């Protein structure tokens, strides 16, 4: 199986456990990119929509491209009632967008699965002049200051966490966007908290 499609085999679990994004992030993104009715937005690989509804709620013309058929179907079930929602089940790398152009293209932990040169050049070419590329990423690498506890947790991971499919990701350097015509590259961080039950 192609690794890029692994989450398509477990859409319900992906939807349940995938981290959500900060409300402040979306408020600032919508303001920065001036997203509102009449603006055209493309989301790359929305999965099950963890970063979709806040953008849909702006009234913009929302368009998504999702590689996974099961994930695309879930997106249609969740957001098909929105008049401004549209999604295509296709591979961004080879998809022909025709004369479509966008005011913002965004990716919530997806763009890094696309070869860097294709990701940056194709998104740049699809943007209207002055358009925005937003790349969202979640990181769950908080390290407790309790070193003894941290080391014990790592021992448990080493002993029991053996995924069926090894996690492989090519090198993707977000700041390299400036090598493809992008300007005003900046990084912002938003912190949150996730809680799980012992069963989870």
Residue map of PLM features:
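Conserved catalytic/acceptor-binding region of the Class I
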Residues: 124, 129-194
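A short acidic, Gly/Pro-enriched loop at the edge of an enzyme's catalytic core
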Residues: 94-105
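A short, conserved alpha-helix within the catalytic core of class I
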Residues: 113-123
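Nucleotide donor/acceptor-binding cores
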Residues: 38-39, 100
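Class I SAM-dependent methyltransferase SAM/SAH-binding core
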Residues: 42, 48-95
